[in-house]
């Protein structure tokens, strides 16, 4: 297995909003990341020592972003800015993730066309699937991103 760069190099995010702790494996259409449930997560509730399960959608989305960032780095490009357009059929077998748990997050590209992509994603805890969903994402071209920035300033 190839040693991957730190997650900070794969994501177009800054701390504290980097929620994925590391990428373990990246292939042509797949990624495997891990998330440590701990106090460093901005969604960590200190009273219950948990992170709400709905944050799992963001764990999956950031794993997809890390996949995109890795493939950009392989082309000597910066990790691109992308947008989560939606998630479909998010299901979770729990209400929250507990401190000390290490979540394995897997995502697989189902289709891609003109910057739009669909990924099937899941979260596992000790080999058991605890959450699943489908993510619809968009990575605009540099020109389209610039156009979007100009429009937002008007």
Please describe what each predicted stretch is.
Residues 1-7, 101-105:
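Short Pro/Gly-enriched beta-strand edge/turn motifs at strand-loop
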Residues 8, 34, 92-96:
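Beta-strand-rich interaction surfaces with strong enrichment in secreted/lumenal proteins
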Residues 15-51:
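Catalytic strand-loop segment that frames the active site of acyl-thioester-processing enzymes
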Residues 17-19, 103, 117:
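Hydrophobic core residues within well-ordered beta-strands of beta-rich domains
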Residues 19-22, 86, 91, 106-108, ...:
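Residues located in well-ordered beta-strands
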Residues 36-72:
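A conserved, well-ordered hydrophobic junction motif at loop->secondary-structure transitions
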Residues 66, 98-101, 108-154:
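HotDog/MaoC-like acyl-thioester-processing domains
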Residues 66-104:
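Hydrophobic beta-strand-centered segment that forms part of the acyl-chain substrate-binding groove
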């Amino acid at each position: 297995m190839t040693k991957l760069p730190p997650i900070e190099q794969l994501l177009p995010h800054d701390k504290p909003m980097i929620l994925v702790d590391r990428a373990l494996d990246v292939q042509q259409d797949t990624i495997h990341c891990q998330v440590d449930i701990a106090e460093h997560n901005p969604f960590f509730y200190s009273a219950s020592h948990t992170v709400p399960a709905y944050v799992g959608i963001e764990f999956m989305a950031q794993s997809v972003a890390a996949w995109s960032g890795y493939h950009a780095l392989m082309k000597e490009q910066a990790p691109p800015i992308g947008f989560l357009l939606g998630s479909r059929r998010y299901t979770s077998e729990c209400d929250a993730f507990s401190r000390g748990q290490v979540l394995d997050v897997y995502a697989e590209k189902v289709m891609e066309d003109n910057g739009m992509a669909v990924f099937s994603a899941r979260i596992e805890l000790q080999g058991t699937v605890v959450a699943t969903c489908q993510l619809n994402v968009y990575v605009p071209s540099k020109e389209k991103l610039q156009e979007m920035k100009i429009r937002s300033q008007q």
